């Protein structure tokens, strides 16, 4: 079996060499004017991408379904490359439409991984989920190779786990992990050779539109049932066509028959090649070295720099700003989403009501009377002034906020806040102040003569072991030192 596989691979390589030179070969592409970069991609796609799908499905379990999702993503990528080879660069709106099917196919892979976190093959699924977005290079410029390498590094985190786990116990799993990384490296080399500044388009053709996908798209080939690792398939002898179907002697059945006829010849497949004489060799014919280099294809335009698409998916619009709210709901004063409003006042209140201020910015609230409690949550640069509270005044998740207490508050709580200025009168010195995960906290005591005395609250603490009590003792660091 191994000898047969080796023989098929050798014949495949010879066929590829014949097809790439185009001389003396009976196999001819259905579309003659495809750029050279697309011909190279079709060979890579057939030999490596399709082979990886088959190897993935062969592992069974959740990878069987994952392989089908990967096959769908590779198919969308192939169709998009075909459109680029036969159309000019589209507008930004049309480009997003062309990228949408590929983006959705990649999302299916990532969603499937998230739904199977308890799977024994989670590292396999994660490697694919982290690495497969490399197909999004088609929307990245001007450095798509760097993008592919980043996806490779993300996938390698999980493939290294697989190698560590299965290198000795199950070489089949380890070989799969290695082959995936080699696939990513190989594709990065292909992009570096042909699309270094971004996806190439055919400048001599009309601009592409999403309708080109419908013309070009066909149902992805169904991968064969898993039966172990299969040898790489031979390169396609007929390029997929966008504008018309191939009929007559170029039909798929005839092409398949031609391929098997070539394979059956064995080593005689290269008998029809022309012999390379000394006058055709560069190192033996000085005149050839003096000639300017030939272009790979007349339809292979120079690289250009498309608009920078930092993200593969379409930009997401910012969430709409929520409306401001200031009203009494049952026994709760609700103040939300106020921005720059410094004239908020609660004049009619009682000791059974509470005040809740949420996500306000640069606003000020004055409370005339006694309430049960006051909470400032996720506010920034806000000021609140009140007379008395029965239970607690609280800062939570705030930034650079101030409070002035004209009367008394039994408890002042400051939690997850950066920047809190608390102005109190001498009657409030008996209040209990509780802080947690906060910084830049100051208590300012207002004297009868109008002066202020500022006391910073500690942010650093020191913990030491007390052998006498067999306990840890925590003390504050003196901020006045």
UniProtKB/Swiss-Prot annotation:
The keyword Cell membrane applies. Its main location: membrane. Residues 220-238 have a biased composition (Pro residues). Residues 319-457 form the C-CAP/cofactor C-like domain. The keyword Membrane applies. SMART domains: CARP. PROSITE patterns: C_CAP_COFACTOR_C, CAP_1, CAP_2. One of its GO terms (cellular component) is plasma membrane. This is Adenylyl cyclase-associated protein.
């Amino acid at each position: 079996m191994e000898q047969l596989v080796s023989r098929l691979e050798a014949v495949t390589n010879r066929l590829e060499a014949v097809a790439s030179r185009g001389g003396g070969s009976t196999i001819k592409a259905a579309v003659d004017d495809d750029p050279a970069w697309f011909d190279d991609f079709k060979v890579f796609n057939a030999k490596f991408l399709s082979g990886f799908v088959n190897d993935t499905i062969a592992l069974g379990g959740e990878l069987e379904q994952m392989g089908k999702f990967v096959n769908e993503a590779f198919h969308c990528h192939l169709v998009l490359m075909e459109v680029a080879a036969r159309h000019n660069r589209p507008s930004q709106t049309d480009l997003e439409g062309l990228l949408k099917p590929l983006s959705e196919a990649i999302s299916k892979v990532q969603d499937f991984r998230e739904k199977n976190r308890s799977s024994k093959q989670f590292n396999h699924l994660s490697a694919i989920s982290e690495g497969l977005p490399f197909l999004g290079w088609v929307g990245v410029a001007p450095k798509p190779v760097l993008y592919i390498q980043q996806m490779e590094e993300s996938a390698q985190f999980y493939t290294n786990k697989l190698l560590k786990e299965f290198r000795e116990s199950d070489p089949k799993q380890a070989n799969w992990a290695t082959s995936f990384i080699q696939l990513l490296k190989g594709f990065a080399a292909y992009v570096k050779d042909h699309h270094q500044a971004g996806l190439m388009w055919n400048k001599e053709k009309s601009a592409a539109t999403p309708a080109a996908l419908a013309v070009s798209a066909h149902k992805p080939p169904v991968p064969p049932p898993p039966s172990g690792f299969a040898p790489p398939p031979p390169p396609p002898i007929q390029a997929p066509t966008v504008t018309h179907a191939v009929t007559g002697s170029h039909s798929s059945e005839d092409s398949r028959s031609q391929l098997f006829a070539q394979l059956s010849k064995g080593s005689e497949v290269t008998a029809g090649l022309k012999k390379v004489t000394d006058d055709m060799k560069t190192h033996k014919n000085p005149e050839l070295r003096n000639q300017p280099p030939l272009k790979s294809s007349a339809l292979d335009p120079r690289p250009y720099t498309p608009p920078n698409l930092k993200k593969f998916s379409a930009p997401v619009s910012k969430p709409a700003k929520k409306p401001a709210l200031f009203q009494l709901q049952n026994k709760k004063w609700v103040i939300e989403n106020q921005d720059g409003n410094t004239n908020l006042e609660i004049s009619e209140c009682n000791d059974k009501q509470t005040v809740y201020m949420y996500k306000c910015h640069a606003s000020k609230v004055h409370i005339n009377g006694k309430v049960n409690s006051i909470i400032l949550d996720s506010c920034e640069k806000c000021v609140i002034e009140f007379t008395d509270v029965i239970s607690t005044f609280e800062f939570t998740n705030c930034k650079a906020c101030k409070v002035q207490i004209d009367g008394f508050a039994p408890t002042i709580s400051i939690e997850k806040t950066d920047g809190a200025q608390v102005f109190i009168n001498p009657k409030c010195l008996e209040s209990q102040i509780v802080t947690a995960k906060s910084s830049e906290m100051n208590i300012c005591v207002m004297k009868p003569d109008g002066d202020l005395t500022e006391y910073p609250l500690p942010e650093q603490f020191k913990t030491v072991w007390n052998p006498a009590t067999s306990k840890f003792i925590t003390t504050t660091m003196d901020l006045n030192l």
